[in-house]
Amino acid sequence: MAKNKNIEVSGRKITLYSNKSDDYLSLTDMARYRDADRTNYIIQNWMRTRSAIEFCGLWEQLKNPDFKRIEFDAFKNESGSNSFVLTPQKWIEKTNAIGIISKSGRYGGTFAHRDIAFEFATWISPEFKFYLRENNQLVHQAGGQLTADGNK
C-alpha cells in the first residue's frame, strides 16, 4: 500500500491511498459522519443491505477474476432477513473480495475502492457524497499531491 493521504469532506478527515492505479477511501472515516463512536455498526448496516451486496458483487465480478460467485449468491439470498449480519471481514474472507480491505491496529479500518466508497457515501448522505466526489476530483486534478491536512 502506498502512503496514506487525507482529504477533508464536510469537516471530516477521510484517509485516501492509492494502490497501483486504484484509489481506496476509508469507510471508517466516512462512517464518522453518521456516528463517530460506532463506525463498525454503520458499515455493517450498509453491507447487509441488498443494494450494497449487489453493487459490491457486480464490482467484484467485473474487476476480480478470483471472486467467489457462489458465496456472493448466498449472501445475496440472505439479504433482507432481519437476522442477516455481514461484516467487511466476512465478505472479504468468504468471497475473496478485493474492493474492500479491512486492516486492524493503528492506522487500520475498513477501506474501499473509490467506486464502492462513493456508493457507501450515497447511503451515508447525498450531500456527503457530493462533497466527497468534488474533493476527490480536486486530488486527481492536482496530480494526487496533498499535504498531511488534505490541502493542495
How should these model regions be labeled?
Residues 1-152:
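An anion-engaging/catalytic patch
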